[in-house]
Amino acid sequence: MKTNLAVFFGGRSVEHDVSIVTGLQAIEHVDKEKYDVIPVYLARDGAWYTGQALLDVALFQDFEAQKQKVRQVRLSTVPGEGLLTDDGNIQVDVALLCMHGLHGEDGALQGLLELA
């Protein structure tokens, strides 16, 4: 059984765009034999999204017009529930934080994930 690896990128910081590049590059180099990758994009407005469409960098040129291609998610506050969607939950075993700047490099997201 593969490990579910959530890769977090984007965010509200001024380094939002470079975080997208970092996240996509990290995903590209993950060993897909060992991990099922769950891309998790944090939009500029703070909403969280997941879906395979996030793997295409072109999606981010006009995300607002394209966001119907992905699902909005939120982090459960119940330990072990992972990410919640309108149609169930997504189990997360490991998180890779590829966010730069505010809420990424300051440990805020890490702290939030540790509480979940």
Which residues does each predicted region cover?
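ATP-binding N-terminal substructure of ATP-dependent carboxylate-amine bond-forming enzymes
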Residues: 1-116
